[in-house]
UniProtKB/Swiss-Prot annotation:
Official protein name in the record: Ent-13-epi-manoyl oxide synthase KSL2, chloroplastic
Record-linked CDD domains: Terpene_cyclase_plant_C1
Protein EC: 4.2.3.186
Location within or outside the cell: Plastid, Chloroplast
Organism of origin: Salvia miltiorrhiza (Chinese sage)
GO cellular component terms attached to this protein's record: chloroplast
Residues that bind Mg(2+) 2: D550, D554
Pathway in which this enzyme or protein is active: Secondary metabolite biosynthesis; terpenoid biosynthesis
GO biological process terms held by the UniProt record: gibberellin biosynthetic process
Cofactor(s) needed for function: Mg(2+)
Matching PANTHER family: ENT-COPALYL DIPHOSPHATE SYNTHASE, CHLOROPLASTIC, ENT-KAUR-16-ENE SYNTHASE, CHLOROPLASTIC
Length: 811
């Protein structure tokens, strides 16, 4: 007999189907171990600042906040006037440097991370050079030199974060300092080590020279000195006049070549920030997409629907126009592609594939990308929808291997900083590898994202920069508050479901297993909004009933009882007391009829029409498919694989769980819609994925029990000449094709007949079955107890780090 979803959620594939699943007192206690008797004081006080937090986040959509870069501002300050080499072009930048030196003599970012001393050294030396060039700030130069001398050892400290190009640029600036006759009393050993390291890197790059090396050298042009071929550098000039959207590189190019477009770009950058510049400009698209990504990953995007829609529309417009801000940056391109495609925009994967081919060929990867970019590209490469996207699929396999290698080597390099950053990054990479986006339920993914969220907002290129759009405590706070609010409602709904089981006497059926918590969990973990209560309970109740009836067909009922049950559903308006063959049939049919009528009444209020007959028809399809399998087993009939799948995708029992819930998620569904081929195709694709996954993992058990199975039938239908391994590979390829087609239909809104919230339910269920089978041997009951606990019973508590950050925000 087929395993319906709720049965799958209970059993290890090797466990016997006839085994009854019961909770011992210990396991029942384990299931609710996370339910705290008293809510923490921090969580209890959260609602008072919920709206304030939401308001602050909303402001991020209207104003991009990006930190000023002292390093880049110093290089812009070195730019001479177009009319006189003896005068600065941007005297206000010089004044900014004079006014923003720190008390210790450095030019560090406020509250900079202690592992950023190399960045501080580089920024401080650049500021000194700018002031010395124009003969101003003698006292500031003196204090800056003193800071460099005291902290020079950090330049070769392997424990410190090394900014991009530091080993080339910093020694070059020391050479410039000597040219300015600056008297730096530096430790000779450290100085010689720096120069030796620079020479080695230059020799290695010359030995392995490639287009990627040329790009890297162009990016760090200010550190190349006389070695730089400026004509080759200008190949990388963008439409806005910049080189790599980087003020320091562009300033160095203007100093060398007097290119007017470079100068125009610098004026634009200063217009944006006043008397200083950022490390990257422009960065608007990436910043806004980071905000959207944070909100979606943490489960709070519903509070910012209008703002997010505006960002998506603008990003799509820029994508279609070929905006360089998207297509010349790997992270931005990958994030834009993933966000747009997942939100139903028609975007080609070609730009992502091209960037992947460029970024990860040769040594360029180590110079211009880090683990965050690799992870972003990996997530984008998962979204293969079309048969002609084989290149993207191949790159996905490469990226997965690369991430696994970096994890195993322990050499994770990040452009992010923060407390326990390595632990957080490793957790994020592990989650991405272990649970592909299609194999994790939405609420489970969001809980994991909240738990491993790194709200440090620092990034590092040649220098560090930060933005609250990249991450902040407000995102984290709002997501925790929202998760716990929903979870409290979910616990009440689970209690209602458990009462329903007792009221309908389903607990009296000795052959049936207790699984209401798991059936409800699959709903709460996929569509969790409070207003979808009726849809969740419909999903869960029908999940309970499908497993009860599956058990009845498999071990609990005689042939006469099974036929009687089907006849009762067909006749519907019958006298239960006289027409039921047995007590068990009476309980099952009574519960089924009462539940279908209840769902029909609720749906009538939303739909404005009676849909009860449709729900009855859905149930009859399932019952007849189960009876057909029973008859096949009785008659020892061996169907073809096509005959089997035509019936088995229905007997997998997802129809009564998913299809009635479509009427309760909000949009109106006309009779034409539910009769449309799209509706039936979505159901078949979803159910086929589930059936094949089940049959692969249940092969050994069902073979031993002499039961029909897609895998065994595939081997039989090929004359026994196909090995089990080859058959499994073929089945997995089939699953992949079906899953991608399902996702394409769910995402392609313009061509769709069904409303998006309805299409998404099919994808949610597909994720449920993929999550269960994502582990080699399936989920054990203990795995599921832990998952149910985290989604329904265990609130997320603010840790000390988050609490401290929030205290500063809300004081």
């Amino acid at each position: 007999m087929a395993l319906p979803l709720s049965t799958c959620l209970l059993f290890h594939p090797k466990e016997s189907r006839s085994r009854r699943f019961c909770f011992s007192p210990a396991s029942a206690a384990s299931l609710k171990s996370g339910l705290h008797s008293a809510t923490s004081a921090k969580i209890a006080s959260m609602p008072t600042c919920f709206e304030q937090t939401r308001g602050r986040i909303a402001k991020l959509f209207h104003k991009d906040e990006l930190s000023v870069s002292t390093y880049d501002t110093a290089w812009v300050a070195m730019v001479p006037s177009p009319t006189s080499l003896e005068e600065p072009c941007f005297p206000d930048c010089l004044n900014w440097l004079l006014e923003n030196q720190c008390h210790d003599g450095s030019w560090a970012r406020p509250h900079h991370h202690p592992l950023l001393k190399k960045d501080v050294l580089s920024s401080t030396l650049a500021c000194i050079l700018a002031l010395k060039k124009w003969g101003v700030g003698e006292e500031q130069i003196k204090r800056g030199l003193h800071f460099l001398e005291l902290n020079f050892a950090s330049a070769t400290d392997k424990c410190q974060i090394t900014p991009m190009g530091f080993d080339i640029i910093f020694p070059a600036m020391l050479d410039y300092a000597r040219g300015f006759s600056l008297n730096l009393r530096l430790d000779p050993t450290t100085f010689n080590d720096l120069m030796h390291k620079r020479d080695l890197e230059l020799k290695r790059s010359n030995r392995n020279y490639s287009s990627e090396t040329e790009t890297y050298w162009a990016y760090i042009a200010e550190g190349m000195g006389e070695l730089q071929n400026w004509e080759s550098v200008m190949k990388y000039q963008r439409r806005n006049g910049s080189l790599f959207n980087c003020p320091s590189t562009t300033a160095a190019a203007f100093i060398a070549l007097r290119n007017s477009d470079c100068l125009n770009y610098l004026h634009l950058a200063l217009k944006k920030f006043g008397n200083a510049v950022s490390a990257v400009y422009p960065l608007d698209i990436y910043s806004q997409l980071c905000t959207v990504d944070n909100l979606e990953r943490l489960g709070i995007s519903q509070y910012f629907s209008t703002e997010i829609q505006n960002v998506l529309d603008e990003t799509y417009r820029c994508w279609m126009q070929g905006n360089e801000e998207i297509f010349m940056d790997a992270s931005t391109c990958a994030l834009a592609f993933r966000t747009l495609r997942l939100n139903g925009y028609d975007v080609t994967s070609d730009p992502v594939t091209k960037i992947l081919q460029e970024c990860f060929s040769s040594s360029f990867r180590g110079n211009m990308t880090d683990i965050n970019t690799t992870l972003e590209l990996y997530r984008a490469s998962e979204l293969v929808l079309y048969p002609d996207e084989r290149d993207l699929e191949k790159q996905n396999l490469r990226l997965k291997l690369l991430l696994e290698q970096e994890l195993s080597s322990g050499l994770i390099q990040s452009c992010q900083l923060g407390r326990s950053i390595n632990v957080l990054l490793i957790s994020q990479v592990n989650q991405a590898i272990e649970y592909p986006f299609y194999a994790i339920m939405d609420r489970v993914a969001k809980r994991k994202s909240i738990e491993i969220y790194n709200f440090d907002n620092t990034r590092i290129l040649k220098t560090s920069y930060c933005s609250p759009n990249f991450g902040n405590e407000d995102f984290h706070f709002l997501s925790i508050e929202d998760f716990n609010r929903c979870q409290a409602a979910h616990r009440e709904e689970l209690g209602e479901l458990e009462r329903w089981v007792v009221e309908n006497r389903l607990d009296e059926l000795k052959f049936a297993r207790s699984k209401s918590a798991y059936c409800y969990f699959s709903a709460a973990a996929t569509f969790f909004a409070p207003e979808l209560l009726d849809a969740r309970l419909s999903w869960a109740k029908n999940g309970v009933l499908t497993t009860v009836i599956d058990d009845f067909f498999d071990v609990g009922g005689s042939v006469e009882e099974l036929k009687n049950l089907i006849q009762l559903v067909e006749l519907w308006d019958v006298d239960i007391c006289t027409e039921c063959y047995s007590h068990n049939v009476q309980i099952i049919f009574s519960a089924l009829r009462r539940t279908i009528c209840e769902i029909g009444d609720k749906a009538f209020k939303l739909q404005g029409r009676c849909i009860t007959n449709h729900i009855i028809a859905i149930w009859l399809d399932l019952l007849n498919s189960m009876m057909r399998e029973t008859e096949w087993a009785r008659d020892n009939f061996v169907p073809t694989i096509d005959e089997y799948m035509s019936n088995a995708h229905v007997s997998f029992a997802l129809g009564p769980i998913v299809l009635p819930a479509l009427y309760l998620v909000g949009p109106k569904l006309s009779e034409d819609m539910v009769n449309h081929s799209e509706y039936h195709n979505l159901f078949k694709l979803m159910s086929t994925c589930g059936r094949l996954l089940n049959d692969i993992h249940g092969y050994e058990r069902e073979l031993k029990d002499g039961k029909l199975n897609a895998l065994s039938l595939y081997i039989i239908n090929h004359g026994g000449e196909v090995s089990k391994e080859a058959a499994i590979w073929e089945m997995k390829s089939w699953i992949e094709t079906q899953r991608r087609e399902l996702l394409r239909l769910v995402l392609e809104g313009k061509k769709s007949v069904l409303p998006k919230p309805c299409r998404e339910l099919f994808w949610h269920m597909c994720s449920v079955v993929h999550l269960f089978y994502s582990k080699g041997d399936g989920f054990t009951s203990q795995d599921l107890i832990q998952l149910v606990n985290t989604i329904i019973h265990q609130p997320i508590l603010l840790n000390d780090q988050t609490g401290a950050g929030l205290s500063k925000l809300h004081d």
